[in-house]
């Protein structure tokens, strides 16, 4: 069917939801194209899209169809342990969770649904804790209020890898019904929908408490500000900090769950606007650090008071500090395993890797997306050859202990608070700790530059851009020689004029250029947002040196994409 045929099918559907019908009636040609040119697709972190009418939107029909695909796969595999379901604070989240449970029940599959919003890491934990076959998380993470999303987890509490997602997509594509209606359940089927017991909350909180390395540290003379950005994390974080005894000031205007994110300029911890109100609180109460989680509670942002000013740390910087703290403390206590392994992604800074290697910890790289890290953890657990000690990615996601198989903002909050308190007791800040790492391992600066390209035109342009870069391999970047090039789509490495196969990764549209000065640049179209991204890991002799290089590299990129 073409776009107009799809549109008319939706418009004339007799059972179409009234709000979706009104949206369809008001669409112009451009809006029709964007809503129907493709079906909603699974990207880096599940299916994430703008709420609304159409095949390329998140609505009850696309949610039901996705869940039907999952149900078909589970029944084909004779799975009988059910599916855990949680949801965040967004518009339609409760309805999407309920509809997912009903579809599963219509296929004879049990579900365990939370009665109110919970964080993404707790959903991952719940799948494992209740020995479920799968999990569904209704969330769009840090995206704007117009979005929602649908993430599927496997029996290990890990987001589905492309191979497993492919099975669900194949099942969806074979569904005969164009519109999946709400099923009319029998009494027996209704009994398959269960509410998750409150005891799971306490079990999860108690597990998170085990990430502390120095719980005996005095909490005196240490204060922090925390905001959940109107999302899911407030109850869990408050429970943790109350148990541990930190002096916490909560940003009250942002503690209530709110799908409109009314009192935050941006709910994304990567964006400085997310900290505006929290920093006002911090200045008033003279807090040592500011912590913020994103709406679904898997990612964490940090600001540190240093020399009288609050400094925002990037995910790479925070990751480096945590790595050094965790590994040094474990080494001191004799609890760092001999076969320790750390995971990070191909667009994460080299600094963390250098620190890990100094402690004898091996490092394995994955593609972007914590699903790959979760999968690696499981592979090594099966082989019993390596012991997980840390996993992280540049986009503010960290995992300290693997009772969760996704990034965990709750674990991160607790450990970073302890880390900051530890350094304060030594008359240091986390910035001082970071500067010591630069002195030891070299100065690094990591940053990102993105082009926002929306709709069908934007998607086509992004594909043309990546193909253009792929077909015209750069031999130098802003005057610096490219000494190695990796194409994760074609799975090749070119070094010293020699082409080799790039193994150990699924195919992905990522290109990476390694420069003679130890820096690298990676480019990829985002799998969760309409953005074409450039990642920079810049190595130099000093802060002035890396800042000058960054300016030069940015100008070069601007010229490339004109």
Q: Each predicted region: which residue ranges?
A:
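An N-terminal, well-structured beta->alpha segment
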Residues: 2-100, 107, 190-222, 232
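Gly/Ser/Thr-enriched, mixed-charge loops and adjacent short helices
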Residues: 15, 31-40, 148-276, 282
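Conserved phosphate/anionic-ligand binding catalytic regions in large, soluble enzymes, centered on
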Residues: 36-56, 141, 228-240, 295, ...
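N-terminal small/polar loop signature for handling phosphorylated ligands or for N-terminal nucleophile
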Residues: 84-147, 242, 247-302
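Short acidic, glycine/serine/threonine-rich loops at helix termini
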Residues: 94-99, 124-127, 146-152, 180, ...
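Phosphate-binding and adjacent anionic-ligand microenvironments
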Residues: 283, 287-289, 309, 329, ...
């Amino acid at each position: 069917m073409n776009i107009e045929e799809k549109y008319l099918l939706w418009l004339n559907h007799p059972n179409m939801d009234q709000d979706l019908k009104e949206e369809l009636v008001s669409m112009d040609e451009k809006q029709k194209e964007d809503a129907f040119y493709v079906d909603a697709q699974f990207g880096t972190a599940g299916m994430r899209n703008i709420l609304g009418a159409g095949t390329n939107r998140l609505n009850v029909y696309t949610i039901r169809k996705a869940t039907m695909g999952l149900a078909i796969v589970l029944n084909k595999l004779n799975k009988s342990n059910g599916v855990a379901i949680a949801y965040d604070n967004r518009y339609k989240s409760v309805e999407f969770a309920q509809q997912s449970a009903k579809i599963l029940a219509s296929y004879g599959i049990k579900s365990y649904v939370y009665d109110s919003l919970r964080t993404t890491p707790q959903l991952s934990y719940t799948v494992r804790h209740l020995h479920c076959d799968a999990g569904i998380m209704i969330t769009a993470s840090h995206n704007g209020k117009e979005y929602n999303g649908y993430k599927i987890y496997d029996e290990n509490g890990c987001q589905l890898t492309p191979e497993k997602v492919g099975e669900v997509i194949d099942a969806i594509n074979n569904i005969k019904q164009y519109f999946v209606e709400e099923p009319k359940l029998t009494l027996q089927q209704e009994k398959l929908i269960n509410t998750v017991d409150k005891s799971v909350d306490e079990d999860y909180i108690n597990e998170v408490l085990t990430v502390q390395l120095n719980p005996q540290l005095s909490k005196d003379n240490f204060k922090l500000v925390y905001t959940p950005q109107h999302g899911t994390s407030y109850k869990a974080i408050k429970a943790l900090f109350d148990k541990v005894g930190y002096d916490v000031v909560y940003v009250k205007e942002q503690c209530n769950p709110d799908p409109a994110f009314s009192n935050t300029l941006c709910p994304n911890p990567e964006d400085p606007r997310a900290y505006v109100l929290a920093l006002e609180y911090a200045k008033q109460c003279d807090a040592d650090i500011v912590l913020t989680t994103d709406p679904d509670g898997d990612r964490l942002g940090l600001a540190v008071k240093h020399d009288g000013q609050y400094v925002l740390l990037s995910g790479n910087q925070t990751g480096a500090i945590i790595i050094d703290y965790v590994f040094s403390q474990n080494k001191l206590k004799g609890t760092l395993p001999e076969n320790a392994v750390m995971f990070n992604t191909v667009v994460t800074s080299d600094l963390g890797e250098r620190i890990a290697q100094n402690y004898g910890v091996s490092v394995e790289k994955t593609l972007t997306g914590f699903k790959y890290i979760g999968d690696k953890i499981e592979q090594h657990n099966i082989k019993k050859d390596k012991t997980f000690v840390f996993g992280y990615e540049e986009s503010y996601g960290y995992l300290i202990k693997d009772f969760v198989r996704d990034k965990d903002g709750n674990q991160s909050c607790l450990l970073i608070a302890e880390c900051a308190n530890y350094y304060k007791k030594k008359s240091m800040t986390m910035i001082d700790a970071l500067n010591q790492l630069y002195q030891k391992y070299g100065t690094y600066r990591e940053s990102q530059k993105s082009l926002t390209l929306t709709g069908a035109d934007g998607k086509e342009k992004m594909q043309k851009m990546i193909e253009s870069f792929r077909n015209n391999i750069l031999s130098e970047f802003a005057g610096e020689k490219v000494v190695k090039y990796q194409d994760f789509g074609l799975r090749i490495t070119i070094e010293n004029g020699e082409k080799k196969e790039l193994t150990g990764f699924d195919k992905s549209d990522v290109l990476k250029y390694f420069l003679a000065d130890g820096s690298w640049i990676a480019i990829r179209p985002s799998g969760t947002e309409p953005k074409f991204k450039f990642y920079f890991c810049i190595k130099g002799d000093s802060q002035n040196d890396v800042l000058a290089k960054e300016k030069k590299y940015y100008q070069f990129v601007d010229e490339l994409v004109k």
